[in-house]
Design a protein with these regions (language model features):
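Acidic/glycine-enriched connector segments
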Residues: 1-112
Length: 112
């Protein structure tokens, strides 16, 4: 991993966000659009490897933005940074399914 071209993400869980679980809320949609713009700007500045925390909420949004960037731009890799093997074990089924889908789509995963 080259630190000069690596960008890391982590953020708030849904409980700390004003819209909580409602990803259709205009504020959430605005945040996701801004994240997509920030990821694109990072790419323009030379970032190619994106490390994503894999918690619910903003971590998921960032991972999804990085994966979308990878579809549009060459040379992008996305790595899931997982704090422990059982991270998603106690989550609701839909959150676990989203987590597994994101991890599967990432190029690499690192267990801390």
């Amino acid at each position: 991993m080259n630190r000069e071209t690596t960008c890391c993400f982590t953020g708030h869980r849904p409980e700390k966000l004003p819209w909580r679980e409602d990803e259709g809320d205009p504020r959430c949609l605005e945040l996701k659009a801004r994240l997509a713009g920030a990821v694109e700007a990072a790419y323009e500045k030379g970032m190619r490897h994106f490390l994503c925390g894999m918690a619910r909420g903003a971590d998921f949004y960032c991972c999804e933005a990085a994966l979308a960037l990878r579809e549009r731009r060459p040379g992008v890799t996305v790595e899931a940074v997982i704090p422990c093997e059982e991270q998603a074990a106690r989550w609701r089924e839909r959150d676990r399914e989203r987590w597994f889908s994101l991890v599967e789509r990432c190029d690499n995963e690192t267990m801390l």
